[in-house]
Amino acid sequence: MVSFKSLLLAASAFTAVLGRPFDSFDGPDVNITDADELLVRRQVTANSEGTHNGYFYSWWSDGGGQVTYTMGAGSRYSVTWKDTGNFVGGKGWNPGTGRTINYGGSFSPQGNGYLAVYGWTRNPLIEYYVVESYGTYNPGSGGQLKGTVTTDGGTYNVYVSTRTNQPSIDGTRTFQQYWSVRTSKRVGGAVTMQNHFNAWAQFGMNLGAHYYQIVATEGNGDFVGTEIWGLARGCRR
């Protein structure tokens, strides 16, 4: 849940992610108009979390603009938005672990948005991101650069930042954010979470008791977003 820098964006700017869900990467594409694929559709309504088709989901929005979160079969989800405040949502697991997450798809943002493995811990209260791709703003750049970690065929810059009196899983709190931001953006491949956790610990960035961990889309901006799909393949739970 990050406040982005203000950007002037063309009215035609858009974001798109297309792909297949975590658990059926090699299966046929699903027609998103099928009624059985569109279980939950929200347009800036109540924030929520729970379980859907065997996966944990979380959805949070600050209530601004127009944003719709749709959950489909298995791990499939989509987000569309226009003129929004901040939102973050996706599907994954509860609790988070050092699992290896394999994913694929396409992601071509032209504004404030990114695709990441996203989660929380308690005691200490930590919000964390492993950012695989992002649009016009590097979401970790407002924090303190701690170093780098090389894993899964790439290098990630590691940042830490502090959020003061901001929304969290435990209400309004002050907490730290941990970031690993891939230097060469990609959509597709493995994310070995344990390697990031180990690197963070070496930089004195300790985690607490894990809450959820999801493949998430986060966005903010005065532009139109088209359909977005988070996906993965062959996940080790």
UniProtKB/Swiss-Prot annotation:
This is Ethylene-inducing xylanase 2. It is an enzyme of class 3 (hydrolase). Pfam families: Glyco_hydro_11 (PF00457). GO terms for biological process: xylan catabolic process. Residues 43-231 form the GH11 domain. Glycans are attached at residue 31. It catalyses: Endohydrolysis of (1->4)-beta-D-xylosidic linkages in xylans. Pathway: Glycan degradation; xylan degradation. The keyword rRNA processing does not apply. The lineage of its organism: Eukaryota, Fungi, Dikarya, Ascomycota, Pezizomycotina. Endo-1,4-beta-xylanase involved in the hydrolysis of xylan, a major structural heterogeneous polysaccharide found in plant biomass representing the second most abundant polysaccharide in the biosphere, after cellulose. May act as an elicitor of plant defense responses in certain plants but does not exhibit any cell death when transiently expressed in N.benthamiana. Its EC number is 3.2.1.8. Belongs to the glycosyl hydrolase 11 (cellulase G) family. Residues 1-19 form the signal peptide. Keywords: Carbohydrate metabolism, Glycoprotein, Glycosidase, Hydrolase, Polysaccharide degradation, Signal, Xylan degradation. InterPro entries: ConA-like_dom_sf, GH11/12, GH11_AS_1, GH11_dom, Glyco_hydro_11.
